[in-house]
Amino acid sequence: MINEIKKEAQERMGKTLEALGHAFAKIRTGRAHPSILDSVMVSYYGADTPLRQVANVTVEDSRTLALAVFDKSMIQAVEKAIMTSDLGLNPATAGTTIRVPMPALTEETRKGYTKQARAEAEQARVSVRNIRRDALAQLKDLQKEKEISEDEERRAGDDVQKLTDKFIGEIEKALEAKEADLMAV
């Protein structure tokens, strides 16, 4: 019973860390990375479709993405979708390839993205703490129902706290890495 609670807490905390990684991937740094375009939706025959389903996104060099659109009639729609996204990118079409140069980040945008990264990290920390609270409440309920002793509850609570500390430490490391990436000129 105790192990199930700890395992569930660990899995949920792992998912929180994974979600933070996805959130950080969407925050643009000065470098080109295909995940930057993950949020772009293209109007494909009347339906909004993720860009990844209508084009192959590759990194041409450290500051340029290259898109190979599968359906040549979709080139204009893909270009428009990238321009109208809130990413601040200006694609350039060269034949059947769309190149997306990454503009250099200004100091102001770097600070804005750093602030956004900190907010995402804080949200992840709060989520991990909520998972800890849920796990501790489940342990307390077990102890009240006399399914486990007070000592077992205390030991399991300490284990949950260690797990929480470990995941919050990983969140801090991820945030430091993202901030360093953002501040690198």
Curated annotation (Swiss-Prot):
Single GO term (MF): ribosomal large subunit binding
A GO BP term here is: cytoplasmic translational termination
Q: Which SUPFAM superfamilies match?
A: Ribosome recycling factor, RRF
List where in the cell it is found: Cytoplasm
Q: Which UniProt keywords apply?
A: Cytoplasm, Protein biosynthesis
Cellular compartments per GO CC: cytoplasm; cytosol
Q: Per the UniProt record, which residue ranges are transmembrane?
A: none
* Protein family according to the UniProt entry: Belongs to the RRF family.
Q: Which organism is it from?
A: Pseudomonas aeruginosa (strain ATCC 15692 / DSM 22644 / CIP 104116 / JCM 14847 / LMG 12228 / 1C / PRS 101 / PAO1)
| Entries under CDD domains matching the protein | RRF
> What gene is behind this protein?
frr
Q: What is this protein called?
A: Ribosome-recycling factor
> Do you know which Pfam families this protein is assigned to?
RRF
- Looking at the record's lineage, which domain of life comes first? Bacteria
Q: State the function annotated in the UniProt record.
A: Responsible for the release of ribosomes from messenger RNA at the termination of protein biosynthesis. May increase the efficiency of translation by recycling ribosomes from one round of translation to another.
